[in-house]
Amino acid sequence: MTMFNGDVEDGGRSNVSCGKDLKRYLMLMGVVALVVLFGAFIYRQSSGGLRLGAMMEQMTGARGAVNVPAQHGAPSAVVDPAMSVPARARVAPPSAAGAIATFPPVVDFGPAPVVSGGPFTGVVTLLRNSVVSVTASSSGGQVMPDPLGLVNPDGLPRFANPTTRSVENIGTGVIVRNDGFIVTNYHVVRGANSVYVTVKDDVGSIRYSGEIVKMDEALDLALLKITPKVQLTAAVLGDSDAVNVADEVIAIGTPFGLDMTVSRGIISAKRKTMVIEGMTHSNLLQTDAAINQGNSGGPLVAANGTVVGINTAIYTPNGAFAGIGFAVPSNQARLFALDEVGWLPTSTAEGPAMGLVAMQRPMGVGVGAAGPVIAAGTPSPHVDGRQNMDCSNCHDIIPAGNGFQAPMMPVAAPVPPPPIPANAVSPHTDGRQNMTCNTCHQFVGGAAAGPIAFGQPMMPIAAPQQPAPAIRANAANPHTDGRQNMNCASCHQIIGSVGAAPIAAPGAGGAYRFSQPPGSLAINIQGPRGGQGAVAGSGGSRASLLGAALTPLTQRLGLQANLPAGRGVFVNGVTPNTPAASAGLRPGDVILKVDGRPVHQPEEVAAIMAEMPNGRSVRIGVLRAGDVSNMSLVTGPSGLAAAVVQAPTAPVVMAGGAPTVPGVQPVIPKVPTEFNWLGMEIETFMAPQPVVGMPGATPVAGGGKGAQVAEVLAGSRAAVAGLQANDLIIEVNNRPVTSPARLDAAIKAATAAGQQILLKVHRNGQEFWIVL
């Protein structure tokens, strides 16, 4: 009995213990299941996996769900991480963890929420009519290819150069006043014979002929002026000093000819100083917003809709955007424009909703249809140029007293009308006789000029095959055969003012050289560095001018001058009628000191000269032919800055071991009279042609003659170095080449030496050095 009871009791205790152990296991499995389900839910939500709406659609079989991805290639809306999800799109969590069945069977999300592109959507809408396309046409040859793909092997900063199409360069500009003033980059319009500006509005686009009002190479800015047929929409130049690193910005422009292209980024840094293609710039804004060829001159825009920079350059190893772009600060652009125009629009509201602009309408006249309502046939009371505009551009037109209103003539003709001579008399009597004829018609130069395709750039008379001589801007027109009615820039290169040097034409083959690696640090020395201008009405800036093109003293140049590399600055070219020329500086000199301070880089010369007021006599220590001498340079106004000649883009290297040969070289038997050397064809030896209206051109050494380049083969060594047709080669490795015999001897000596070849070149009254 006792034994039996003991067995029963033991068995009972054993069964109870087994049940308790099973409960623990079941509870543990439940907890693990809950954790797994909850983790899966969190993972799907955080990894962008299957969305709740899609999960419910699968479970409930709903076919009419609204929140479905965009189909047929239409991109779905992207939600900015900083934006909150709309309340109607949120889904309540399940009532119990892991209980999928507790979701409601159908959830009505309503219409799909419209997700905007953030605060910049309204900004782009605000500025879409303030950004223009700038086309600069210049004479030249073919675009030079880059067969090796070495566009910029050093990865140095270079200008976001305009898209080059043969001899047309396409950039971007910003309307800064609604009466036709536009800011763009200097390098977009530099050397252009004609400039065209395409302005867009809500209806279409209008192409205007533009006038270059002002240029500043140190700032890389240019001010254009067009005569608008309608009121324009001006952008507001904001305060670039108020922009902080990491602030969001957008870049608007015409990359590769694709107008109104918008890219987004941030302000990556603020650069105190930076050298771009030989020019020292200050306070540039660095951004990662995409800037490409054609973006030059376009706006960099802050979230409040104001322009905080003018896109100008990129840092790239291969010519493509590499995430580093630079913009001229808007404060510099404002001062640059104010020196000429007197006033600019200012914002009256801040923040993303900004849209009101003060001083946008001079003398209180409304913009667009904001003027008072007037009756049809009311004569224009204006005398400031608006009397030539269509009244409907600013006013709403109501019928006259008899209730009848004549049909309005559209500004743009629906069908392109025929081209007409510039002096044609308007045959219209329906009101169009009061309009500007080029609103509808394209002008041709004169009675003998044939029609040209509508909408193409106007070239009334084809320029001669040989480039005409450079002339001064105010030179009198000597023609009487109809060309007196033409724009002189159609055939001639225009020099800005008395003593100004010709603006160098585009690089070899007609392509702008901004896309090539800057081998020399040639710099237009003027101050304040970076182009800080003075506020209008201050009596001008304290800027000083040297008037010389400088380059660092390299090791080979140092050997030639018996100086260690970096001690001094090499003078690569001197502009006539500038302080540098008056002081006696010559190409080939080495500047050792400026105002008693040693200099080692062109930027140091720029910084010292920037401190000097106008009229100050500055002592310059110069090394020439082994002798050190001091020169007194009197600084001049910054208005002469555009006169400085551009140094060649190739590295300047003095060829050693090639002494100057005095006297006349002995005539070598069978001297050729035509030369085909390094891609150059040379047939003629001549004295340089004088530049019309420009005294003080540099005389040619060695008897006054040189070897004229008849043609340059595209892609050749000569083309890559920057030589152009009609250049006059004065010296080859310090040997004068005034005759075929001398050139032949110089070529043979240079070939035998096996070194780089240094050419002294004369172009448009200027001498400079080019290395081959």
Swiss-Prot record:
<dbReference type="GO" id="GO:0004252">
    <property type="term" value="F:serine-type endopeptidase activity"/>
</dbReference>
<feature type="active site" description="Charge relay system">
    <location>
        <position position="296"/>
    </location>
</feature>
<dbReference type="Pfam" id="PF00595">
    <property type="entry name" value="PDZ"/>
</dbReference>
<dbReference type="Pfam" id="PF18509">
    <property type="entry name" value="MCR"/>
</dbReference>
<keyword id="KW-0472">Membrane</keyword>
<feature type="domain" description="Cytochrome c">
    <location>
        <begin position="445"/>
        <end position="558"/>
    </location>
</feature>
<feature type="transmembrane region" description="Helical">
    <location>
        <begin position="22"/>
        <end position="42"/>
    </location>
</feature>
<dbReference type="InterPro" id="IPR041489">
    <property type="entry name" value="PDZ_6"/>
</dbReference>
<dbReference type="GO" id="GO:0006508">
    <property type="term" value="P:proteolysis"/>
</dbReference>
<dbReference type="Pfam" id="PF17820">
    <property type="entry name" value="PDZ_6"/>
</dbReference>
<keyword id="KW-0408">Iron</keyword>
<dbReference type="InterPro" id="IPR009003">
    <property type="entry name" value="Peptidase_S1_PA"/>
</dbReference>
<comment type="function">
    <text>Acts at 2 distinct steps of magnetosome formation; required for correct localization of proteins to the magnetosome while the protease activity is required for maturation of small magnetite crystals into larger, functional ones. Probably cleaves at least itself, MamO and MamP; cleavage requires the putative transprot domain of MamO. Involved in localization of some proteins (at least MamA, MamC, MamF, MamI and MamJ) to the magnetosome.</text>
</comment>
<feature type="topological domain" description="Lumenal">
    <location>
        <begin position="43"/>
        <end position="772"/>
    </location>
</feature>
<feature type="domain" description="PDZ 1">
    <location>
        <begin position="522"/>
        <end position="626"/>
    </location>
</feature>
<dbReference type="InterPro" id="IPR036280">
    <property type="entry name" value="Multihaem_cyt_sf"/>
</dbReference>
<feature type="binding site" description="covalent">
    <location>
        <position position="391"/>
    </location>
    <ligand>
        <name>heme 1</name>
    </ligand>
</feature>
<keyword id="KW-0068">Autocatalytic cleavage</keyword>
<dbReference type="InterPro" id="IPR001478">
    <property type="entry name" value="PDZ"/>
</dbReference>
<keyword id="KW-1133">Transmembrane helix</keyword>
<feature type="binding site" description="axial binding residue">
    <location>
        <position position="441"/>
    </location>
    <ligand>
        <name>heme 2</name>
    </ligand>
</feature>
<dbReference type="InterPro" id="IPR036034">
    <property type="entry name" value="PDZ_sf"/>
</dbReference>
<dbReference type="InterPro" id="IPR001940">
    <property type="entry name" value="Peptidase_S1C"/>
</dbReference>
<dbReference type="InterPro" id="IPR009056">
    <property type="entry name" value="Cyt_c-like_dom"/>
</dbReference>
<feature type="binding site" description="covalent">
    <location>
        <position position="394"/>
    </location>
    <ligand>
        <name>heme 1</name>
    </ligand>
</feature>
<feature type="short sequence motif" description="MCR 3">
    <location>
        <begin position="470"/>
        <end position="494"/>
    </location>
</feature>
<feature type="binding site" description="axial binding residue">
    <location>
        <position position="492"/>
    </location>
    <ligand>
        <name>heme 3</name>
    </ligand>
</feature>
<dbReference type="InterPro" id="IPR051201">
    <property type="entry name" value="Chloro_Bact_Ser_Proteases"/>
</dbReference>
<keyword id="KW-0479">Metal-binding</keyword>
<dbReference type="GO" id="GO:0009055">
    <property type="term" value="F:electron transfer activity"/>
</dbReference>
<keyword id="KW-0645">Protease</keyword>
<feature type="binding site" description="covalent">
    <location>
        <position position="488"/>
    </location>
    <ligand>
        <name>heme 3</name>
    </ligand>
</feature>
<feature type="topological domain" description="Cytoplasmic">
    <location>
        <begin position="1"/>
        <end position="21"/>
    </location>
</feature>
<feature type="short sequence motif" description="MCR (magnetochrome) 1">
    <location>
        <begin position="374"/>
        <end position="397"/>
    </location>
</feature>
<keyword id="KW-0091">Biomineralization</keyword>
<keyword id="KW-0677">Repeat</keyword>
<feature type="binding site" description="covalent">
    <location>
        <position position="437"/>
    </location>
    <ligand>
        <name>heme 2</name>
    </ligand>
</feature>
<keyword id="KW-0812">Transmembrane</keyword>
<dbReference type="InterPro" id="IPR040963">
    <property type="entry name" value="MCR"/>
</dbReference>
<comment type="subunit">
    <text>Might interact with MamB via PDZ1.</text>
</comment>
<dbReference type="GO" id="GO:0020037">
    <property type="term" value="F:heme binding"/>
</dbReference>
<dbReference type="GO" id="GO:0110146">
    <property type="term" value="C:magnetosome membrane"/>
</dbReference>
